[in-house]
Amino acid sequence: MTTVKLTYFGHSAFHVEVDGVGIAIDPWITNPLSKTTLEDYLKNFKTDLVVITHAHEDHIGDALEIMRRTGAKFFSIHEIYVDLTQKGFQGIGANIGGPAKLDDVAPGLGIALTPATHSSYDKGVPTGAIIFKDGKALVYHAGDTGLFAEMQFIGELYAPKVALLPIGGHYTMDIEQALLATKLLRPEVVVPMHYNTFPPIRADPNEFKQKVESAGLAKVRVMEPGETVTFEF
């Protein structure tokens, strides 16, 4: 069994602890919904790796300061890797495809970058990311994305245990699109994200929960900023 502790900070910011290894994903800890200060985060959460799905400010967020303060490496698409290494940060660049083996971070750890339909300034393509442990797909963070057909392949290949999906619309999937994404991805648990941070992305996560669960697609866990849930897979 693998223990996964998932903490949500609002917007699309998460900390994922996999058997004691701390991974921050799109860590905009200081977003308007967050109840956690950056100092509290640094004090209470171990960060071994920072995953950046794309170059927009609300996803790079506090990543650079976290890396400066902790010495954590980052993982990203190659173009972000080039940009940040030129600024003195240590990281691992990858591209969309099979999982990168990150045994130097933790034995059995892997991350695969997936497509995402969005934008990323001039810093390569936007991505999602799947965290693996010993070949098992544990957590899929979709990044900022609209619905795309290849989600079916992610489901067929990996069926990630937990899917973190945007539901706010306007810039990403809305509730109806995220509902279909859940069907394609086949996760056990879905956590909605990227909603209610700003007026254009207002959405009701409980409406999403009702639609997904009434269709029998997955269990939906609506997380409050600052909440931590633990899974055993």
From Swiss-Prot:
Signal peptide start-end: none
- Gene3D superfamilies from the xrefs? Ribonuclease Z/Hydroxyacylglutathione hydrolase-like
One GO MF term attached to the UniProt entry? hydrolase activity
| InterPro entries (alphabetical) | Metallo-B-lactamas, RibonucZ/Hydroxyglut_hydro, UPF0173, UPF0173_UPF0282_UlaG_hydrolase
Q: Which UniProt keywords apply?
A: Hydrolase
Family, as annotated: Belongs to the UPF0173 family.
Q: What is the name of the protein in this document?
A: UPF0173 metal-dependent hydrolase Igni_1254
**Species name for this entry?**
Ignicoccus hospitalis (strain KIN4/I / DSM 18386 / JCM 14125)
